[in-house]
Curated annotation (Swiss-Prot):
Keywords: 4Fe-4S, Amino-acid biosynthesis, Branched-chain amino acid biosynthesis, Iron, Iron-sulfur, Leucine biosynthesis, Lyase, Metal-binding. One of its GO terms (molecular function) is 4 iron, 4 sulfur cluster binding. Gene3D superfamilies: Aconitase, domain 3. [4Fe-4S] cluster binds at residues 262, 320, 323. This is 3-isopropylmalate dehydratase large subunit 2. Pathway: Amino-acid biosynthesis; L-leucine biosynthesis; L-leucine from 3-methyl-2-oxobutanoate: step 2/4. Its cofactor is [4Fe-4S] cluster. It comes from Pyrococcus furiosus (strain ATCC 43587 / DSM 3638 / JCM 8422 / Vc1). Belongs to the aconitase/IPM isomerase family. LeuC type 2 subfamily. Its EC number is 4.2.1.33. Catalyzes the isomerization between 2-isopropylmalate and 3-isopropylmalate, via the formation of 2-isopropylmaleate. Pfam families: Aconitase. The keyword Flavoprotein does not apply. It is an enzyme of class 4 (lyase).
Length: 380
């Protein structure tokens, strides 16, 4: 039996109705949820939280009015609203909201981030989340699982981003529709574990989860990844699975570097970038987005923020930043970006005529110094 089968109490392929231990949404999805909820329900019967993280503080009157609507709804239904403290997925972890929880639903596709904590976490659309708010439960089809066993330890330049990019390349031609990824023997810290599960939806997986002991029982596919044989990787435009070794695109001129997001905006990741930038000056626009206010505070307390500022980087208030192309750091026509985020589709960070490459924070920081995509091996 897979880990997810144990949590949901059934076999893959079965449909089950289960109570949801936690449901959450953000300022980008909540207006549609409110519209759907008000058509059918009058009372919230779920444990719910709302986070303002996508476009905050409000940059336009239209968005300010939408956020006011969310606040009014939350006040009526006594739902906590957390504003400007960071990205929802990160805050759920920091606030300990998954304690004593097994099933979590978020109104965001990267909700599987929380699978790093060993919970079944999935993203759903506005209508489904509205129903969960009204009923406190929903139906699930139990997904099949791919077991991924990590072996060895990575080199100093390889991070969790490289592991998940490698996995995306392995699963590129495999049908992951309604299948999950279960990771085992993971040697990373929590900061890096969250990157693994955050990124699995880019393989078209239903969710991801990290377990302790691999049994091999009930898995539709098994993969082993030798970490000590991995090198820094880059995803080329316009698909996160379009993965190549960094040396294949080395020398590509870039206009902007973004280090942050729900993928790589935690303290360990940003501090590694800061170590590289310390005492140097960036050659291109370099934007850093802490995943939470707690991360930002620690950056200040431990001197990480100072290193970044003195190197010429701009530190954003905690939130999604330019990742979704709506706020702070949007890119223009023909611009080339190296980003530590999880998506590089056309138009993701602004102009559909821009090109987005994805990498780990170490590669991004080194590239910011040279103004072009640079292999950290040999450069530092």
């Amino acid at each position: 039996m897979t880990l997810i089968e144990e949590i949901l109490g059934g076999k893959s392929g079965e449909s089950v109705v289960r109570r949801v231990d936690l449901v959450y949404a953000h300022d980008g999805t909540m207006p549609l949820i409110i519209e759907a909820f008000n058509k059918v329900f009058a009372t919230v019967r779920a444990r719910a939280y709302i986070f303002f993280d996508h476009v905050y503080p409000a940059p336009t009157v239209k968005i300010a009015n939408l956020q006011k609507e969310i606040r009014d709804f939350a006040k009526r239904h006594r739902i906590p609203v957390i504003e400007g403290q960071g990205i929802s997925h990160q805050l759920v972890v920091e606030m300990g909201l998954t304690e004593n929880s097994k099933i979590v639903v978020g109104a965001d596709s990267h909700t599987p981030t929380l699978g790093a904590l060993g919970v079944f976490a999935v993203g759903m659309g506005a209508t489904d989340v509205a129903v969960i708010l009204g009923l406190g439960k929903t139906w699930f089809r139990i997904p099949e699982s791919v077991g991924v066993i990590l072996e060895g330890n990575p080199s100093r330049y390889v991070m969790a981003t490289d592991v998940i990019l490698h996995l995306l390349s392995l699963l590129k031609d495999y049908d992951m529709n309604y299948r999950a990824v279960e990771f085992f023997n993971v040697p990373f810290s929590l900061d890096e574990r969250l990157t693994l599960t955050n990124f699995v939806v880019e393989a078209n997986a239903k969710t991801g989860i990290i377990g302790e002991e691999y049994t091999g029982d009930g898995y539709v596919k098994e993969l082993e990844i030798e970490l000590n044989s991995l090198n820094p990787l880059v995803a080329k435009p316009h698909n996160p699975a379009n993965v190549v070794p960094v040396e294949e695109v080395e020398g590509t001129k870039i206009d902007q570097v973004f280090i942050g997001s729900c993928t790589n905006g935690r303290f360990e990741q940003i501090s590694k970038a800061a170590e590289i930038l310390e005492g140097e000056k960036v050659a291109v626009r370099t934007i850093v987005g802490p995943a939470s206010m707690n991360v930002y505070k620690r950056m200040i307390e431990e001197g990480v923020a100072r290193k970044l500022i003195e190197a010429g980087a701009v530190i954003l208030p905690p939130g999604c930043g330019p990742c979704l192309g709506r706020h702070m750091g949007v890119v223009g026509d023909g611009e080339i970006v190296l980003s530590t985020t999880n998506r590089n589709f056309r138009g993701r960070m602004g102009s559909p005529n821009a090109q987005i490459y994805l990498s780990n924070p170490i590669t991004a920081a080194v590239s910011a110094l040279y103004g072009e995509i640079t292999n950290p091996e040999g450069a530092i």
